[in-house]
From Swiss-Prot:
Segments on the Extracellular face: 73-512, 569-584, 641-660, 723-730
PANTHER family per record: G-PROTEIN COUPLED RECEPTOR 158-RELATED (PTHR32546), G-PROTEIN COUPLED RECEPTOR CG31760-RELATED (PTHR32546:SF16)
Cytoplasmic side, ranges: 1-51, 534-547, 608-619, 682-701, 752-1093
Protein name according to UniProt: Probable G-protein coupled receptor CG31760
A Pfam family matched in the record: 7tm_3
Keyword Cytoplasm carried by entry: no
InterPro entries linked to this entry: GPCR_3_C, GPR158/179
Organism for this UniProt entry: Drosophila melanogaster
Annotated transmembrane regions: 52-72, 513-533, 548-568, 585-607, 620-640, 661-681, 702-722, 731-751
Membrane topology recorded in Swiss-Prot or TrEMBL: Multi-pass membrane protein
Glycosylation sites: 94, 236, 462, 476
Amino acid sequence: MKCWHNVVRRRRKKPTAAAAAKGSKGSHGGVASPRDEDAICQRQQQVDTYTWLTTQAVPLLWLHLLLLVAFAKHAAAATTIATNPEATTTTVSNYTVTTTALSSSTTTTSSGSAPALSSAADKFAGNWANLEDSFRNIVRIGDGNTVTRTSIEQSLVTIHDIATENLGTLCISTLYRPLQVPINSERYESSRQKTDLAASILQEVGIIRHGGLSDALAKGLLTDDFITGARILALNLTNGAVQSYVWWVKGTAAEIQRYDEDGLQIGKKPAGSYPWFDDETSSPTLRSPKFAPSPPNNYYKGWWTYPYFSCSQSRWLVSYSIAIPPIGRHGLRGFISIDIDVSTLRVNQCEAEPYPFGSRRQKMQQLQTHNRLGARRSLFLGSRMGAIDESTINDLQAFHSSHKCHRTSMVCDYRQPSAETPTVTGGKLLTTLTGSSSWTRGSYQCLCRGGFYSLRHPDGFNGTIMEIAWQEQQDNISNYYSEVFKCLPCAPGCDTCTGPEPCLANYHWPFRISLLTISIGCACGTFVLAGYLFRHRRVKVFKVASPIFLMITLIGCAIMYLEMVAIFPYLDTTWCIATKWTRHMGFCITYTSLLMKTWRVSLTYRVKSAHKIKLNDQQLLQWMVPILLVMLIYLGTWTISATPTAEVILDQSQLKFKQCSYNWWDHSLAIGEVFFLAWGIRVCYNVRNAESLYNEARLISYAIYNIALVNIAMVVFHVMLFPNAGPDYKYMLGFVRTQLSTTTTIALVFGPKILRVFKGQGDKWDQKAKVRSITASFSLNGVGLVPEESPDLYQENEELKEQVQKLAHQIEFMKTVHMQMNNRHLKPKPGGYFTITSTSFQAPYSKNTVSTAQTQTGKDENSTPTKLKSPKGKVXRGQRSVKDCSIEIDGGQGRTTLVEDAIEFNFHLADTEKGLIVQEDERPGSDEEEAALIAQFRRLFAPILDDSLNLYYQLNDLDDTEHVRIHQTVAQMNDLTSSEEETMVTQVNSPSPPPVGVELLLPISSDSSTASSSLYAIHTPSPAHPSGVLLMPQNLESPLLSGSDAITITEQVELHNPPHHLQLLEDENNTSCSLSSNLTDSKTLDGRTPIVV
């Protein structure tokens, strides 16, 4: 189709020439007639059909036959590429592997090649593995032609014989020795086009009509740089005899000479030994075995020969011949042929990238094919295959990758042979005959690849020796090729070596397995401990330590233990990723959980305000999650963007082993962890003096110190002290770091707790913590010493603040009381709660060691029995004191005593006042009611006074000492002076609202040298509070005596006599009973407010 298309295109381009051709009566004036063009296209179509049958149909039949034979014999052995170079292939653009069968183009090769191919087919059929060789046996060169491996090997033998003068009778009997491999004709495309043009001219003009035209055309062809000889023959169409010929050759000095050949004689046929000529009678279409097949998709007017050696010219030549058809039936048939010297080309048997000849579009197509097949080509081509360069322009591409080096262990290196290069037979290369030494078999050196070595031939193996050794192995003469001429593999891990010395560091597997077993056991023990903690999470020793944070700590420790699993095997990318994640994520989880608990203690310990800092587990988890999220995002980004890989490092013996790479991701994370450790150390330093339940804060601080110290120490060991340590030493350092940091943390945090549980003290509170008054704020879970049901912390805080305020008010109240009692240096405040009635200070102790507590109420005219309740309408009740008081009452018949406690309240009447006591005989049961009233008084005031005095004297030891000294001085002064006071006692027996008569006695002077102060009180029953006691203001005007003068009502209360063997300070403390009320509110009691019991 392409031929017909070209014909149509030429007709359109030259309509004038076609018209001239029609009027010339069949003569051709330089333009082919349509009839000739049609004949040419028909002949080309026949040639293409025949080519397809010989190159594709027949090989397909052979392929099916080989498959059937292979499946029938069931071969199991496989011959490797190293021992069978025939199994190699090249897959560049001109070496594309085809799927045609192992067969020759029956008419394209010499008669001797068919038996060789048949024997090769029989050889391959017996082995299934060698079936692949049939696919690799046929290769394609740059211009599209195909060639078999057998043809290549036979051509190499021919080249070797010629190069080593092993010619025999070649140049005597046979002047030409052709090869069986085609040459890439694209390099001589310009020469071919010139020859086609000359053939077209001769065809149009005619050979005999112009005698000088043939000489002119032959000489013109010699102007081409590549053409060294041109010949034009005029042959008889009937018998094929030579009618005339011209043969011009280019001399050594570039002069043109006529060449006379004995094989060409007028009237005789040309000799059949000429490789550039074939008779049309034997080969009508000139598809002779002497000619190489034309490249596909290309139309040539003539045929290229195989390269051949010319003994007469002593050079390697290739010819292009064109048969010129006759003009008529009885005309002459022309024949034109040119010779191109290819002696300057070289036989390069190594892998090389072919030079892309042809047009620009063809070069681009070849480059695209080269890029597309690059991955597959790298499996077969040597390591020296590089980019397309100018050094391959002179290579015979058919011989590429035909070397005999072992493919897996050797690489071919082309060496240009010199004239002095010796051969195996002891001779030298033929340079006088060939004029060049580039046409030599074995012009290469087999060098050991990286990872292989040869002790006998460290510089490589000579290519000629490798060719002979391979041929001997093929002929079963010797096995030196596979046993002697080979490279041995280096020890594992060696890129290059010169011997069998090891390159990888040795791994002591029993030692590593023992450390791994311990680490896995610790990880399993951590999970068991987590289950034990979950089961006993309600035990107080675990509950106060936040079980959720303890569980998180155990999870982090288990992850840190698993790092030993990640660094156990030979490291690669997967294990390096696992190493980074287990190391840093485990550290972050463990360290953060411990730090959060310590931070809670730090914040509570440093607080200076009265506000409660509420830090429960949920809040700490909310602070912990962002820290873990930052680490998670960092490790994820690291893994995706710059995946950690295993890099090779050297130990002190220069042995290699793999270690995970360290880059700026590691350095940045290390800096962040250092700052994190520094913050943890700062927090632990702040709580160094803080007290906590079970001493947990201090143990966690020790654990954090230990983690920081161990990590810093291990960095120093790895980087500074042992930078070239071997893999076992590094694994041991990792084990030590894991055990010192993780196991020690578990022992410090969980060891004391588990020990207490085993001792049966898990549910018992820490007694030392109780003694140190450890509150809930200093507990690591924010609860402290609490029952099972935790109360509201805010309510607890408010109650504590209220108690503190009440105690402060009581202390201030007692200070005022003790300052004003019997202190003559202070002027009493009018209307105060305690008022001294006499300006003369009375001694607290009389001569008979009886002290009198004097109390006087202020005067309040509006004080009535109906206003005897507290302002809030509640009755203020006292609390029973731990230190009870006993009360004695002197009645009319004698002394009535209530002995319930160690301290007594004695109500004595002075001797001078006994006569003024109102008779109570008319009221039955007065003594019992009086005793009940006094008991109520004791229960109200005694406990408050006792607790307040104890607290006051504890806080004011110096003031208490001075107070006792003042009392001693006043007592001595009272011994020298005496005074009398009038005392009146009235008893009101009627509870009814109407006025009841009260019998009053006149005051009688007391015989005692000392008199007590007055405590004014009225004993009046009331409906709400029968037999109640009402403390009235001073100078209270009785409603019974409203018309008379105000009468002062007193009641003397005398405390019991202190023991004589006690010191004065102790006596002073024991004689004090509380007179204050422990009310529900925290306000200071007003002195004028009545208290109802």
